[in-house]
Amino acid sequence: MFESYKEEVTFNEQRGSEDFDPQNEFYKEYMEESFKKDITSIGRRLIGYMLVFFFFAGVGQYAAQQRAVTAEDFYGMVGVWLFIAAGLSLLIWSFSKKFPMKRIYEHVAPRKMTIQSFAMICASLYGVRFISKLFLGGIEKLLFEMGIPVTLVANTSEELTSSIIFVLYLGVMAPVVEEFIFRGFIGYRLERYGKVFTILFTALIFSLFHANITQEVFTFMAGIVFAYVAIEYGFQWAVVVHMMNNFIFAVVLDIYLAQMMNLGDFSIVQLLDLVGFIILVLVVILKWKDIKEYIDVNRGFYGISQITFTRVTIILYIIYLLYRTFLPYFALYLNFY
């Protein structure tokens, strides 16, 4: 993990014009025109994906609220409709010639996963959780001072595990579909324009899609980890890490291990988060030179962000998801006053 990045240029040259160096002026004009077409296509498909997913997920939540008697019934109904929503969403991308499935399977990862790298990646996710909880604590305090009493930092509810269907969606279906869409179809399409831009952009649209501030803070940082793993170690490893985060970390450790190992005021989950944070800080300090080199070698061409965030479809995607994110808090604020 973060060994040396001078190999990146050689790696790109070996793969041909599909992955040219984004800093080469000879390709700049071509890159801009090609990127405009790609980001426009991505924006249109993101809008379709968003509408389809939230429509069927919304139908499932409404049906569960109307008919469910127990927590198992509620999460079972929601889980079924989430499977439908995710499956149909994946089909939207799968049948596109612009985003062929073979690009994902044919992607050549420049690095091989080692036990040490895998352990550091897993620890980094716990470190990310620690940082996200600090951010959420600050946001929670700010909202409280504005007269909006909300709880953003809370333990995972055991009710989530009452339905096996919902657990399967959370631990298997969601990671697979999200990795296909955000890191596979989108990430591998944009990789040639600069890995750093690709990692940050896919992390942003991935986090916004959760439309929940509690999840968005964590999923943005986790999305950076997932995207880095997908690009550097391969799609299959991104799926594995994502599954571990959703199932092993969020369900097995946060719920069951926390109940089995009661450390008093300081829970086992908090201990793991703290250890992960310490490891993450050490990795950043010890590998800072390599991280900086990676950013320098793999940054996108000048103006790539301006082109991206002036696309109408990208703007609409961001605005709608921000609306869904903050609407509940505006409603609380209006009700309070």
PLM features per residue range, with description:
Residues 55-64, 91-92, 127-140, 229, ...:
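Alpha-helical membrane-inserting segments
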Residues 1-43, 99-107:
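N-terminal juxtamembrane cytosolic/stromal segments of multi-pass membrane proteins
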Residues 27-32, 62-69, 74-126, 138-143, ...:
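Membrane-helix interface linkers and caps
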Residues 23-82, 178-181, 244, 249-265:
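Transmembrane alpha-helical insertion/packing segments
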Residues 75, 105-177, 329-337:
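Juxtamembrane helix-loop-helix connectors linking adjacent transmembrane helices
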Residues 37-49, 73-82, 113-121, 162-167, ...:
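Residue-level signature of transmembrane alpha-helical entry/exit and packing/kink sites
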